[in-house]
Amino acid sequence: MPGLKITLLQQPLVWMDGPANLRHFDRQLEGITGRDVIVLPEMFTSGFAMEAAASSLAQDDVVNWMTAKAQQCNALIAGSVALQTESGSVNRFLLVEPGGTVHFYDKRHLFRMVDEHLHYKAGNARVIVEWRGWRILPLVCYDLRFPVWSRNLNDYDLALYVANWPAPRSLHWQALLTARAIENQAYVAGCNRVGSDGNGCHYRGDSRVINPQGEIIATADAHQATRIDAELSMAALREYREKFPAWQDADEFRLW
């Protein structure tokens, strides 16, 4: 059964400067080989800016760059960007394969405390991406607080979060990532940014990968621009879910 080698890039972002951010990640991705999935933070071309979509790089430009990086690294490249679409502005999580196939998920839960819901259109569909034998559920930042949306119906193996999660609530980030892994009996990975943004908001990072029993198998140092690597085991995941099949006793409800 295939394992999954995942890399999280915990990095600062240049405020509202798409080309500068792409150049930064060009440098971070240089020389990375032998990975299956490489993850960048939420809104990696701009930082978490409410006006980002209006002045953002075009989706085609971002996708072309991600495709080139996916081919270079022979890996799925994943991260969210602010985009202007025909139906409105979205916070779109893009997952791009080396062959050019593009998967996307539009952030469902918009952070009203900074009026994200007034600037962006919420997504309305869960997406499962199948990649190299793994089923991946992409989610974005504030989605983490809403467990029904990430409820595992035995339809995914890895919940993958990207975020701009502020330092004052870092305890919530760490606790909720662990909770999502335990309750869903799945791997969870969360890639957060570091540094400060144009609004003076500070970010610790605390990016991590957690196994289905809630054990942290890789974690990034707080406030450090770094990368972390982990290898996920499908055999271990299946063995645990078979030996402790709590998912079979889940309440029968569905809200989407």
From Swiss-Prot:
Cross-referenced InterPro entries: C-N_Hydrolase, C-N_Hydrolase_sf, Omega-amidase_YafV, UPF0012_CS
Keywords, ordered alphabetically: Hydrolase
Superkingdom of this protein's organism: Bacteria
Signal peptide positions (record): none
MF-aspect GO terms: 2-oxoglutaramate amidase activity; omega-amidase activity
Catalytic center residues: 42 (proton acceptor), 107, 141 (nucleophile)
EC number: 3.5.1.3
Domain called CN hydrolase: residue spans: 4-234
Keyword Metal-binding on entry: no
SUPFAM superfamilies for the chain: Carbon-nitrogen hydrolase
Gene3D superfamilies with a match to the protein in the record: Carbon-nitrogen hydrolase
Biological role stated in the UniProt entry: Hydrolyzes alpha-ketoglutaramate (a-KGM) to alpha-ketoglutarate (alpha-KG) and ammonia (specific activity 6.65 umol/min/mg), has weak activity on L-glutamine, almost no activity on deaminated glutathione (dGSH) and none on glutathione. May function as a metabolite repair enzyme.
Database matches in NCBIfam families: PRK10438.1
Family of this protein: Belongs to the carbon-nitrogen hydrolase superfamily. NIT1/NIT2 family.
UniProt name for this protein: Omega-amidase YafV
The species this protein was found in: Escherichia coli (strain B / BL21-DE3)
Encoding gene (name): yafV
